[in-house]
Amino acid sequence: MCDDVQALVVDNGSGMCKAGFAGDDAPRAVFPSIIGRPKQKSIMVGMGNKDAYVGDEVQSKRGILTLKYPIEHGIVTNWDDMEKIWHHTFYNELRVAPEEHPVLLTEAPLNPKANREKMTQIMFETFSVPAMYVAIQAVLSLYASGRTTGIVLDSGDGVSHTVPIYEGYALPHAILRLDLAGRDLTDYLMKILMERGYSFNTTAEREIVRDIKEKLCYIALDFEQEMKIAAESSSVEKSYELPDGNVITVGNERFRCPEVLFQPNFIGMEAAGVHETTFNSIGKCDIDIRKDLYGNVVLSGGTTMFEGIAERMTKELTNMAPASMKIKVVAPPERKYSVWIGGSILASLSTFQQMWITKEEYEDAGPGIVHRKSF
């Protein structure tokens, strides 16, 4: 396969798309996975108005656009819009000709087979790529941490998964999905800040709350204890300056917001928290490999970026696991992008080059070829 041509790595998340070149240590382009279409067909002549906007451009024009997220809970649900996102990725963000580069795409765990075939078809038929490959997101995160066995808790904007992986292969029967992620935490923070008398309603204000979440929230080691401390002193209080210059004070909301990951009932969800989901996932695996999984719990995705998460995970898993079990939770500092980084590593390995699905193979066998050549 083309040794001299750099492969492209595209990680399509529910909230953000991360894209760049294999061999790089970080993605070149990170933009929101959103499509915006004008609410009215333009009356303004000669404005050069497009029928659709993608990514950051949508954010700046959001008042006049109808917004759509083509990836819901990690799964592509609107292929026309997805095609626009890929087009934008290649031509506007990376500024490359896709027909000249092999492309590594990522997919959610348990992505339906038909979806994977559709991705393959679009890459070869619409973008004429010379070769492509589809890898499971959590597996890439594990590679990025230098492991081939472990359990990944991957939590992004739209969905969380626990994915046990043994010697490089995900174990599908033990993968669990939790429809609780960054977007829900932002919603919950909006709600509890309202109780303090701060009102955030519009989509633009929602972005402000997301920023507050990312900058000020943390996970308590002991929630009840932290609530007591917060009630008795102002040590947890922090101030945040809004874009208009006003300053707001955030107190116990700082740790109440991400506590939802461990106690989904806070937002009325009847689901196990991330710690329990991880435990259940390990329990679905063969007893002989559980020790290897408990010793390699790898966090991945933007929603695992909260301070204190590794300590809390360790504590909760220790309480649930068999008494003698050694538990190690790994939280790599670059975990926000570890899926992309894993893809960058994989696509540049010499041993991986025979794994690409080439245009010729696709033309011979059709979209089904993707199942034979991906893990």
From Swiss-Prot:
It comes from the Eukaryota. Residues 1-2 form a propeptide. The modification N-acetylaspartate is found at D3. InterPro entries: Actin (IPR004000), Actin/actin-like_CS (IPR020902), Actin_CS (IPR004001), ATPase_NBD (IPR043129). Gene3D superfamilies: 3.30.420.40, Actin, Chain A, domain 4 (3.90.640.10). SMART domains: ACTIN. GO terms for molecular function: ATP binding; hydrolase activity. It catalyses: ATP + H2O = ADP + phosphate + H(+). Its main location: cytoplasm. Its EC number is 3.6.4.-. One of its GO terms (cellular component) is cytoskeleton. Keywords: Acetylation, ATP-binding, Cytoplasm, Cytoskeleton, Hydrolase, Nucleotide-binding. It is an enzyme of class 3 (hydrolase). It is found in: Cytoplasm, Cytoskeleton. Belongs to the actin family. Actins are highly conserved proteins that are involved in various types of cell motility and are ubiquitously expressed in all eukaryotic cells. This is Actin-1. It comes from Naegleria fowleri (Brain eating amoeba).
